């Protein structure tokens, strides 16, 4: 059981590190396709989402 908790803690820490790589840019949007060119310009990657009318880029 101790091994399970240890693996769970490691998984949570790795997930937090991965989530911290997201980049919000000050660009308004209504659909995710509007974020792609803005994210390519900002960080050089096309992976993006439109969340709460703001573009979120993923490196």
Curated annotation (Swiss-Prot):
Its main location: secreted. The record marks 58 as: Aromatic residue of the functional dyad. Disulfide bonds join 29-50, 35-55, 39-57. InterPro entries: Scorpion_toxin-like_sf, Scorpion_toxinS_K_inh. The keyword Secreted applies. Keywords: Disulfide bond, Ion channel impairing toxin, Neurotoxin, Potassium channel impairing toxin, Secreted, Signal, Toxin, Voltage-gated potassium channel impairing toxin. GO terms for molecular function: ion channel inhibitor activity; potassium channel regulator activity; toxin activity. This is Putative potassium channel toxin Ts22. The lineage of its organism: Eukaryota, Metazoa, Ecdysozoa, Arthropoda, Chelicerata.
């Amino acid at each position: 059981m101790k091994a399970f908790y240890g693996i769970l803690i490691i998984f949570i820490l790795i997930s937090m590190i991965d989530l911290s790589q997201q980049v919000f840019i000050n660009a308004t949007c209504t659909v995710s396709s509007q974020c792609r060119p803005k994210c390519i310009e900002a960080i050089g990657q096309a992976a993006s989402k439109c969340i709460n009318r703001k573009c979120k880029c993923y490196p």
